[in-house]
Swiss-Prot record:
One of its GO terms (cellular component) is cytoplasm. This is Kinesin-like protein KIN-12A. The keyword Cell inner membrane does not apply. ATP binds at G221, Q222, T223, G224, S225, G226, K227, T228.
Amino acid sequence: MSTTLRRAWSSLNGNDGVLPYFLATLNEVSLLQARPPPGHAAAALALRRRRRDTPPSRRRVPKENVDPGSSPAGHSPFRSPTSSAKPLGNRNRGLLPPRPPSSNPLKRKLDVSPAAAADSSGGAAAAAAAAGGGCPAPDSGVQVVVRIRPPCRVEEEEDARAPDLCVRKTATNSVAIQGQDFTFDAVADEVSTQEDIFKLVGLPLVENCLSGFNSSIFAYGQTGSGKTYTMWGPLSALSEDSTCSERGLTPRVFEQLFSRIKEEQGKHEDKELTYHCVCSFLEIYNEQITDLLDPSPKSLQIREDVRTACVYVESLTKELVFTTKDVTQLLVKGLSNRRTGATSANADSSRSHCVFTCVIKSESKNLEDGSNSTRTSRINLVDLAGSERQKLTHAFGDRLKEAGNINRSLSQLGNLINILAEISQSGKQRHVPYRDSKLTFLLQESLGGNAKLAMICAVSPSQSCKSETLSTLRFAQRAKSIKNNAVVNEQKEEDVNMLREQIRQLKDELHRMKSGGSDGSNGSFSTGWNARRSLHLLKMSLSRPTTFQTIHEDSGDVEMEIDENDVEKPYNQDNMVISPPGDKECKELQASLKINGGTSLDVFDGENLMPTKRSCSDDRYKLNLAASIQRGLQVIENHQNNGAWRRASVGFNARIVDVQPCKVDVAIQTEPEESEARDNPLALISSHVLGTSATVSNDPNACRDLQLVQYDAGITRDEPKQQQILKAVEKVLAGAIRREMARDEQCVKQAAEIQQLNRLVQQYKHERECNAVIAQTREGKIARLESLMDGTLPTEEFINEEYLSLMNEHKILQQKYENHPELLRAEIELKRLQEELELCRNYIDEKEVLQEEIQDLKSHLHFMLSSSASIRRLWPPVQLSHGVGPSPVTNDADGDNNAVDTPDWAEAESKWVTLTEELRVELEANKSLVGRLRSELESEKKCSEEVKEALQTAMQGHARILEQYAELEERHIGLLAMHRKIREGVEDVKARAAKAGVKGAELRFINSLAAEMAVLRAENKGLQDQLGDTAEAVQAAGELLVRLKEAEEAEALAQRRALLAEQETEKAYQEIDNLKKNYDQEIVALNQRLSESSHHQETTLAIEACDMETTKYDTAGSPGDQQWREEFNQQGGSFEVSKSTDLNSWFSGYDKCNI
């Protein structure tokens, strides 16, 4: 073996000595030690054969592309067997190869066993077969998929002399280039489709997103390798039908996402599951961030939230999406605004990195426990600009500047990935330069943070792009070593501790009753105190199980006999239930709320005390309120007059603690007489008690001290005692199971406490961050003062910076002050009190105004009614002409008729009188209605005053009851002290009895102790009954308060109805005024027309008399005059007739229109 080791060391110092040879030598040594070697010559021959079969590599790996961990050689078991990497040079090689770090995951591949040595040649093929067969590998945090772009026509023409592709797919998850094999999660060759890429990367991303994980997809590669096509597809495919085969990864992801959202919502309809998706689209061009959804020339800035340590882009447009069509529209808009340019390598080259982000928030509610769950996940789809070389792209000007920024950004990304890979492999912490570029700073969660990362590395198979393809594959290999820490982003809002919450609410209610009870007469009682809420809190507190505090004892098991009858009674009373009363009590008091049962208290050996349970019956609302109040008052008076009540130094604890049932030491004494067993108060527990405690107990300490004791075989003939022994054994076994279950419950409670402590830690962390910001401003101020003292900073600039710093500090302190919970609570309380005061003032002012308006309307109505009769007597009766009746006719000498219409004023006046009478009747009805409503309002006011007085009295009684209830809780300490003393005395008696044995004198002493304990038990039961009666009285008072509150609401409703009636009366008054005004105007118009009509008749009669005299003295007339008369007659009659006709017709029509 020494010869073999010497040759191994010489091989390490030779030209071909590398780590695999040393490992193979160690393998040979292990084989030689496992079985007797045939000789040193055989071992040396095997070593020389292994060295001869392994050809050396001719190619060195560039130092910047070496894996961040230790770089094994080409034929190491760490690499694929077909690798042909060149060994390390002499200057990098020492006596021993560098030891890989202990946390290097590649060490798992090393196996120096004989089986591993035999199968070392097919290791890579087996790994590839396992990956291809669908066997899930351990999740490394980063999924790397390589996609080989099919060669284009130009590349086929250029590579006509060398038709072989530079990279080829050798397995489902490995590729080969220049004799080197690279293994990844999956490899998509030239014939792969967009659907294949979506199945490899998109489907897991959607499922991770719905599970609450942050997920990211990076597309990396050289320019023209198909990154943009893979991520988005052509723009024509986005605007076409969704069945287009060229659609990219992003639209397919969101189509699947919305489909799964609908499926989840249909599956969890009972949880009220809702989803909200918010998308944004940005690009990084020449280290400047712009918004693709809002193409403005301004540059956006990256901000970091100091409270949550989240990085975000300020003023970035965010769109809420609901369907795949909405996402497609955003993609089309953003990609059309993205900066692209033409180069010699790519006609449509992307000149910027673009990031499409979608934040998905899901909210669900569990109806069983009332908890709310919120999951938030983020999807980052990143299309990186391709790296390029100037000698291939022939870029100049702006294109050259863009290429420099792109290469610089990708170089910083590669440096970051190298550091992260080194940290993941070595476990040593290093500074991670996230802030070197805006790309890495923006996506730091995806790189080594809380996200699941998938990287699509696009490569070109052309021989001209061989070096870029090799660099991309090495980059992907380094990225595969990164370890992310993805967690589910879920927040659950669980219910708070009901015990503390109810105690706090009851104390607040008591304080509110004491402070605001005397303000109930101001009309705003309902705004300051809610009786229904107080009753609900009281019922919840009474319905919760109540137990005493746990009293631990250090004494061990003592063999004693326990009286079965004395112990069974309190165990049978294991529930305190507020149940409907029986038939007898319903006949006497239908409203009494019966509280049955009591607490199960083991005063002998009970480390824990039996819980009491209350369950409120729904039938208590149907009982009579008055009888219930009377019953409660009687109970309180009886308690005050009872001497035992005053002498009792114990109280009932209504505080809710953990349910910890009792345990009883079950043992057997050697006395077989049944009479002594019946007389002994420390007899065996009945089987019913054992079964009950076995099924109810959940205490981890329950039955801790139970054991089986030896007993005399002579008394086993008693069959009942044998059954008791068997059931005691059953209880011991059940106690073991209960202890295990109780341990689980204790773990749950401790987890809840840990969660509460975590919340406190988060709160303290937030305060520390605020203090850190303030400290940072102080340090900046000190630095500015130093610069000012040194003279490097001008005074004006110092003043400006100091002012800005102080403004920022003031803003931080203002936010801290405004967000203080005490300040917010005080502001809310002040606003509530101001609103109540304003309501009271408005109510008083409106009441006074309404009363004044009612008085004015009453006086105005009285005046109108009294004046209408006098006005009607003063006006003469008028007649209106309808122009349709017969009229007197006068004939002139030419046969013309003059018709004069006589207006019928009496008929019109009768109509007006009828209308006035109707209005008077309606007015009287309104007056009676107002009087009735006024009387109702007065009665409601009286009722309201009575209700307020009763409510005040009930409030005072309720406050006294609550004080008594609180006093009972405080007096529970006295009960615990008394119980401890009793238990110590019993323990002393047990110890003495165990030492001396149970004999006549000792038995009588024990009997006397049992009598005292029975008295104490009876007193305890009386206290429980008193507490039940108190609870009954409290509930009755609560019911009274609720009824009084409802009466107050009815009073408010009656007041609103009275207000509506007054408004209707006011409207009636307004209608009467309008009718009177119209009536006055019509009367004046009719008088004027009557005077004009009489004057017109007189004028007409005078004209007709003149015409008759002229006709009498005229002769036959001249021919001209005769001709004029004929022409006038042909035109339609004489002048007088036409005039008279026109006047009559106009007056008649006018009268018709107006009447």
